[in-house]
């Protein structure tokens, strides 16, 4: 029996790739645990680490550690025997939801996104029932799909979610620009939730300023289906190809409609992007302090 060390370098939710690593090694009889640092490195036969973001600091790891994730290389892949393994929740005993992909890939080629490079064109990945394997998951499902409606089984999967009365979080967001009436109507029948499963939220994105007309049309479709603006959260990308004025216009347009903007800085080290994101995303400050007053106090 080998001893396997696991290290999650970033990310706020359980790491599915590391869960597959754990699942594979547990299946062949290995002992899997969290890696405890260089002082204990010699006790492990193999060490795996995952890094999702390039800006995350890299700790010192043994030379033979297997390091993967988009923060290291867009194109790296799990070995087939690990990719095909059933994820193990043993690393995350407090995880109280089911986690997985119903599809992978993306139909779009946004210049700021690595998904098309890493996953390619959309393809179906798992059925809803295949994802429901967490013994502590209850009726909570978190889907990691980057282009949910790009999968050919999107309708069957939504109907299954509705049938099973699952609370579902589309954590990567949905594309409201091309949302159809049928899709909006089925979403309205879902018990859609936020990341903590304690509020009714559907997450979309307004990344490009010029998509404003499409965003408004998508919001109207949601309203027509019975989804109120108060249930709509929008990722708002800043610092890529928009001006501060365009950032403010998108945020205030959404806020004035009763939707919830959530700013995503393209460059977290940029002073303006960091401050603007903090101002918008801290709801109490956003509602009570003007940007002109806040930005001067953060200089």
Specify the residue positions occupied by each region the protein language model found.
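Flexible, charged surface loops at secondary-structure boundaries
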Residues: 1, 38-45, 59-62, 93-94, ...
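A short, structured N-terminal alpha-helical element that caps or precedes a catalytic domain
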Residues: 1-67, 72-75
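Core AdoMet radical
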Residues: 6-7, 11, 48-49, 115-219, ...
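Canonical Radical SAM [4Fe-4S] cluster-binding loop centered on the CxxxCxxC motif
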Residues: 17, 94-131
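Anion (oxyanion) recognition and catalysis
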Residues: 26, 162, 223, 255-256
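Ser/Thr/Gly-rich flexible loops in soluble cytosolic domains mediating phosphotransfer, phosphorylation
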Residues: 66-92
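Flexible glycine/acidic-rich beta-alpha junction loops that bind and position SAM and/or redox cofactors
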Residues: 238-244, 262-299
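Catalytic cores of alpha/beta
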Residues: 241-258
């Amino acid at each position: 029996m080998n001893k396997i060390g696991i290290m999650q370098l970033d990310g706020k939710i359980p790491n599915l790739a590391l869960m597959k690593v754990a699942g594979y090694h547990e299946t062949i009889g290995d002992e899997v645990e969290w890696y405890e640092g260089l002082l204990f490195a010699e006790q492990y036969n193999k060490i795996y680490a995952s890094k999702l973001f390039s800006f995350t600091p890299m700790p010192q790891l043994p030379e033979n550690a297997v390091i993967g994730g988009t923060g290291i290389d867009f194109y790296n892949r799990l070995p087939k025997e690990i990719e095909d393994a059933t994820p193990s929740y043993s690393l995350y005993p407090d995880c109280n939801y089911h986690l997985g992909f119903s599809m992978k890939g993306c139909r779009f080629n946004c210049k700021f996104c690595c998904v098309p490079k890493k996953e390619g064109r959309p393809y179906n990945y798992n059925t809803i029932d295949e994802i429901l394997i967490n013994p502590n998951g209850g009726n909570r499902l978190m889907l990691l799909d980057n282009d949910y409606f790009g999968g050919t089984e999107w309708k069957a999967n939504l109907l299954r979610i509705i049938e099973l009365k699952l609370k579902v979080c589309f954590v990567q967001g949905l594309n409201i620009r091309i949302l159809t009436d049928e899709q909006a109507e089925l979403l309205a029948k879902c018990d859609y939730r936020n990341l903590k499963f304690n509020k009714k939220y559907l997450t979309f994105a307004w990344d490009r300023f010029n998509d404003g007309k499409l965003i408004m049309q998508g919001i109207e479709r949601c309203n027509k289906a019975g989804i109120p603006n108060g249930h709509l959260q929008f990722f708002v990308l800043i610092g890529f190809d928009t001006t501060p004025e365009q950032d403010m216009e998108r945020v205030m347009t959404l806020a004035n409609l009763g939707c919830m903007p959530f700013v995503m800085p393209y460059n977290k080290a940029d002073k303006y992007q960091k401050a603007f994101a903090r101002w918008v995303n801290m709801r109490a400050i956003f509602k009570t302090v003007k940007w002109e007053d806040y930005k001067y106090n953060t200089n």
